Amino acid sequence: MNGQLNGFHEAFIEEGTFLFTSESVGEGHPDKICDQISDAVLDAHLQQDPDAKVACETVAKTGMILLAGEITSRAAVDYQKVVREAVKHIGYDDSSKGFDYKTCNVLVALEQQSPDIAQGVHLDRNEEDIGAGDQGLMFGYATDETEECMPLTIVLAHKLNAKLAELRRNGTLPWLRPDSKTQVTVQYMQDRGAVLPIRVHTIVISVQHDEEVCLDEMRDALKEKVIKAVVPAKYLDEDTIYHLQPSGRFVIGGPQGDAGLTGRKIIVDTYGGWGAHGGGAFSGKDYTKVDRSAAYAARWVAKSLVKGGLCRRVLVQVSYAIGVSHPLSISIFHYGTSQKSERELLEIVKKNFDLRPGVIVRDLDLKKPIYQRTAAYGHFGRDSFPWEVPKKLKY
């Protein structure tokens, strides 16, 4: 059941097909704990002061959470309470799990935003004309292979982790703990630049568990209650390989097993290795940080192009300079899946979207305290967010 120990299983891969793999991590993964705490801090400020300037990094290790960063805000935030509630929600509520929100130490090293940055970016400017908070390049990607316009590999990897959390919280699998990782390999066929998923080739699940449960029971439950509940049956066949709890034991997890840092799961947060990534992380940052707001806008552009039928798969790049409001460059790559040229698509994008941060914030409602929800299971492909609602394009 658990595949060959040497990993790769050379089942015949047909000509014109290829394998692609994406991973995801659960809420209790140490890096994801940090992302969620950073965004909980951001939300706490935005609830009281929608114009708060927040850059909050989190570090987690056994029994300790450290907040470090720069925040300028009119809000009065109880950081101890915000951090502990975030950890409690994730499920680390007892020292037997390796971490406990009630007893962990919360260290705060937060300062004001640099006045040099403030005067260069937003002071004495109309909101529409505020500058980008930093230089950088961001990408948005969309593909017609799923209803969400996301790669199937990352959609399934996220859903497996979400199902683990659901079965842990509702008591169906009481041996589950909050830390988990999943990885999904899909066999694809190329179709004139677009990609068509044919089957799931390999699934990996590693999830933290209590001392009592036996390996066979875990592997059986992961296959029957998690994988079969999440992965459509048409993608599974007798050649699908499963690596379920491949290390054999995963009792020590969360920040006790590994140190955690905000911003170390940027591929999990985006497209699972598809498209491209400019390197900037999302969590703990307000909308003036284009790492976040422009990546959300680029996804909005990409999804609008695909849902509008203008192409089947597309990559959008934007770039910025600190203090400059308009993007320095906008580029569109349609992989040959459009009737229109990339230049024509670029003109449509320029006509329909204003990619200044001070306009993105209005169009996507980015002053609302919605960010903690984005910090697990991916920022894209989930209906509840404004950047996932395609814009009707005029051209």
From Swiss-Prot:
L-methionine binds at residues 70, 113, 258, 289. InterPro entries: ADOMET_SYNTHASE_CS, S-AdoMet_synt_C, S-AdoMet_synt_central, S-AdoMet_synt_N, S-AdoMet_synthetase, S-AdoMet_synthetase_sfam. It comes from the Eukaryota. Its EC number is 2.5.1.6. Its cofactor is Mg(2+); K(+). Residues 113-125 are annotated as: Flexible loop. The modification N6-acetyllysine is found at residue 81. GO terms for biological process: cellular response to leukemia inhibitory factor; cellular response to methionine; one-carbon metabolic process; positive regulation of TORC1 signaling; protein heterooligomerization; protein hexamerization; S-adenosylmethionine biosynthetic process. This is S-adenosylmethionine synthase isoform type-2. It is an enzyme of class 2 (transferase). It catalyses: L-methionine + ATP + H2O = S-adenosyl-L-methionine + phosphate + diphosphate. Detected in kidney. Transmembrane segments: none annotated. Gene3D superfamilies: 3.30.300.10. The modification Phosphoserine is found at residues 114, 384. The lineage of its organism: Eukaryota, Metazoa, Chordata, Craniata, Vertebrata. Belongs to the AdoMet synthase family. The gene is MAT2A.
